[in-house]
């Protein structure tokens, strides 16, 4: 009997050295399957049960852990972006408004008759009245004669122009003939020459050189 027990003890020790106790204890007797004898005995794993990994497979456990963490991440989540510039709200009910932006300065909004300056740094609104430039009044062109007398008679000989050819001069003076118009042109040119001569004489008299010549012409004896 003693000789028969020794081989069993040696086999048990060798089995414990090759297979740890934790793993051998985890394996149940009903999990042992006999070797298949025919193709019908082959049990292929289904896709549903293929993801159930055993406790002994370290690499498969890492893959399963990575899949679980990746399932919790939604790759299609939109990226949220918060802009730095926030424009304060302006009550624009029914009035018209215009935005005027410049590349280096703040944004200005002209609303109705008031100007609002929007600063990008401290998000404040400054009320500024708009400066309106007064346009100069339009100078009405003065006509030589009234509207009732316009083109009713010749400006030189005073003949009636009704039913006759009219010769215009300067766009507002009508004459009965080319001769009257030529006389008027000559009179205007003579007046212009007289004006230029008078202004030239005034400039000569007011110059210091002309005053020196008048003083040097006289002889004073003491």
From Swiss-Prot:
Q: Where are the transmembrane segments?
A: none
Q: Return the GO cellular component terms, semicolon-separated.
A: cytosol; nucleus
* Keywords, comma-separated and alphabetical: Cytoplasm, Metal-binding, Nucleus, Zinc, Zinc-finger
Q: Where are the zinc fingers (FLZ-type)?
A: 149-192
Q: How does it assemble?
A: Interacts with KIN10 and KIN11 via its FLZ-type zinc finger domain. Interacts with KINB1, KINB2, KINB3 and SNF4 via its N-terminal part.
| Family under the similarity heading | Belongs to the FLZ family.
Query: What protein name is recorded for this chain?
Result: FCS-Like Zinc finger 13
Q: Which organism is it from?
A: Arabidopsis thaliana (Mouse-ear cress)
Q: Gene name on record?
A: FLZ13
